[in-house]
Amino acid sequence: KFMNALMDNREQMLNPTAFIQSTFNTVGAQLALLLKIHAYNVTYVHRGLSFESALIDGIMSIAEGKQHVLAGAMDEITPTSHIIQQRLGLMKGTTAGEGAQFFLLSAQKEEQTFAELKGVDTFITRMSVPEISNRMHHFLKSHRLAPEDIDWFISGKNGQKATDSVYTELEHSLFPHALHSSFKEQCGEYQTASSYALWMAAKALKEEASSRYAL
């Protein structure tokens, strides 16, 4: 609605209410009102890094002394956004998805705790497979782990050959011994789909006693 009004009015005399009350801007506020949470509340709209940004913020808050942090992500399919992504070729060969996942982060292990988040790393620059491999080695080493420690490698394969081939090469070169799976086969492709991957990993670690580390 806001974008249509932006075009119709040639970027002049716009009422910002529709933007202010848009889904992404109100979910965090509505949850806080419903749950009566009067604490730090922030929403990240960083496309594919939105959930990771929220997660890193939550980890930093825990490090600063907070005891509990609610972190999560949500996305929904709208006809307009779906058409635009199709025209740009972003959905070619993939299945569009949507979802919402939330996690309660705690400073200490509690009775309900069933997984530990060891760390999060992000990068947005284009890298070759060897560069990505080196970065993953460094990430694991920073947490006193090696590739052979990983029991389950969860990739973001979505049906696009160009990116799927990168995951396949990493599976063969770094984690040939691990269980391989693609979470987007279940949830589809959307900007915060990685939140589904984290839920999927945490749930599996809870149910499968034989698995210790998932990446």
What are these regions (language model features)?
Residues 1, 56-57, 127-151, 162-166, ...:
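Conserved active-site "lid/cap" helical segment
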Residues 2-56, 111-112, 165-197:
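Conserved catalytic cysteine-centered active-site region
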Residues 2-6, 81-92, 170-171:
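Short, surface-exposed, charged loop/turn segments at secondary-structure junctions
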Residues 45, 69-75, 215:
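Short beta-strand segments
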Residues 73-84, 92, 119-129, 155-165, ...:
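Acyl-CoA/ACP chain-elongation machinery
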Residues 82-152, 177, 215:
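Condensing-enzyme catalytic core mediating Claisen C-C bond formation in acyl metabolism
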